[in-house]
Regions:
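Basic, amphipathic N-terminal segments that precede the first structured/catalytic domain
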Residues: 1-61
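Acidic (Asp/Glu-rich) sequence patches and key acidic residues
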Residues: 51-70, 78, 90-91
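Conserved catalytic cores of phosphodiester-cleaving nucleases, focusing on short active-site segments
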Residues: 66-68, 75-86, 114
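Flexible, charged surface loops at secondary-structure boundaries
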Residues: 70-73, 128-130
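Catalytic cores of nucleic-acid endonucleases
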Residues: 84-143
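Short, low-complexity, polybasic intrinsically disordered segments
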Residues: 129, 133-176
Length: 176
């Protein structure tokens, strides 16, 4: 299956969750109608797809916020929106540590659960074996105000959630 075919599968089965712009997935932007620019290629509200798929079934796992195709439709993209600006501005005042916030964000868990949901919907357990995949993290950091410091803090926080391919493979192979 190609990235475009996977995207089309979601558009056909969950068309009501197609949004014309990524900010249509963000609650704050949607409520305040901040985004009036329509993208050339819409995204799919993956939280909506997940909620629909698991409705009345069982506990709903975490998921990424949206999916789309990118890179001239060569890549299937998982998109996560994170509001880091407020967190970074008040980091000294907050009682939660960076680690607690990272655990709350659970980026690797969301990506894993989202991939599993794609496999369930398509019925293909080997879906991502050869499918070009991209994880996109969209933030609200202003590039005009201390962009390097903000970016550094964000990368340090993300690095703590990352795993090496080796440890990921070892953990997955133990499950078999």
């Amino acid at each position: 299956m190609t990235p475009q075919q996977l995207y089309d599968t979601f558009r056909e089965q969950y068309g009501e969750y197609v949004v014309p712009a990524i900010c249509g997935v963000d609650k704050a932007c949607r409520l305040n109608k901040r985004c009036s620019v329509v993208q050339s290629y819409p995204v799919i509200d993956f939280d909506g797809v997940k909620d629909c798929y698991y409705r009345g079934c069982c506990p709903t796992p975490a998921s990424v916020d949206a999916v789309c195709v990118g890179g001239k439709r060569k890549y299937f993209c998982f998109v996560e929106l994170k509001g880091w600006k407020s967190y970074l501005e008040h980091i000294d005042k907050q009682k939660r540590s960076v680690n607690e916030t990272i655990n709350k964000y659970n980026l690797s868990g969301k990506l894993f659960a989202s991939k599993k949901l794609c496999e369930k919907i398509t019925g293909l357990t080997d879906l991502f074996d050869n499918l070009p995949l991209v994880f996109i993290l969209v933030t609200d950091i202003d590039i005009n105000v201390s962009p390097m410091a903000s970016f550094t803090n964000m990368l340090q926080s993300l690095a703590q959630t990352s795993t090496s391919k080796h440890s990921e493979c070892v953990n997955e192979s133990k499950k078999c």
